[in-house]
Amino acid sequence: MKRLFLSIFLLGSCLALAACADQEANAEQPMPKAEQKKPEKKAVQVQKKEDDTSAWIKTEKPAKLPILMYHSISSGNSLRVPKKEFEAHMKWLHDNGYQTLTPKEASLMLTQDKKPSEKCVLITFDDGYTDNYQDAYPVLKKYGMKATIFMIGKSIGHKHHLTEEQMKEMAQHGISIESHTIDHLELNGLTPQQQQSEMADSKKLFDNMFHQQTTIISYPVGRYNEETLKAAEKTGYQMGVTTEPGAASRDQGMYALHRVRVSPGMSGSAFGAYIESMK
């Protein structure tokens, strides 16, 4: 009888041990794919295309656009505007409801006679000085403004000029880098072939550096001739800007657009009156 009980006890123990082992094995197995929790997909925000003008305001006459012309944000001569004055100008634009444009938006506004806001402006800087990054860029970010820097190709990374890294950082925050030619030569003193080379090489440089279609060129020192205008169109630009005074309009020709020179010594209110006079 004792032997029978002992046999039953041993048999039960073996069965219990087998069941435990089976449970442990199952616990170590991965969850079936159907039961695994899949990572949640993040919602993707689709940004409105830059060339979507469906909600823009139609103008009753050829659109006029003030294209502001700055150079260095410092002091010392008539091309330099101190940071304090520059900030006063940007604050005035912000407080008075002006929308700052990209070159692409400016091109659409001038060619389609439509505008994204009642008050628009294109802010530009010639030459690509380091202080555009150190002093202008923080102010532009503060007020949520776009701007365009016309960079000299050969000056990238040179003393007092922007580096590639600085330009790429700004390009991620609403600052467009566009063409001021390769060598900053007075174009009206060059042959047609030399002009084309200056423009084409600069466009290729910035197209590749920023994975973009470089849209606009600023002629060095404002010097140009009829061959310059032909070369700008032939090399693939959509616009060219000069130093001729006044607001831009397509009546001037898309490759001979005027600009509004901003000189030092202007308070915010004086700057505002100047801009309002361009209407």
Curated annotation (Swiss-Prot):
Q: What is this protein called?
A: Putative polysaccharide deacetylase YxkH
Origin organism is Bacillus subtilis (strain 168)
Question: What does the UniProt entry say about where the protein is found?
Answer: Cell membrane
The cross-references to Pfam families, in alphabetical order and at most eight, read:
Polysacc_deac_1 (PF01522)
UniProt superkingdom: Bacteria
Q: Start and end of every NodB homology domain? A: 119-279
Recorded GO molecular functions are:
hydrolase activity; hydrolase activity, acting on carbon-nitrogen (but not peptide) bonds
- What membrane topology was assigned to this protein in its record? Lipid-anchor
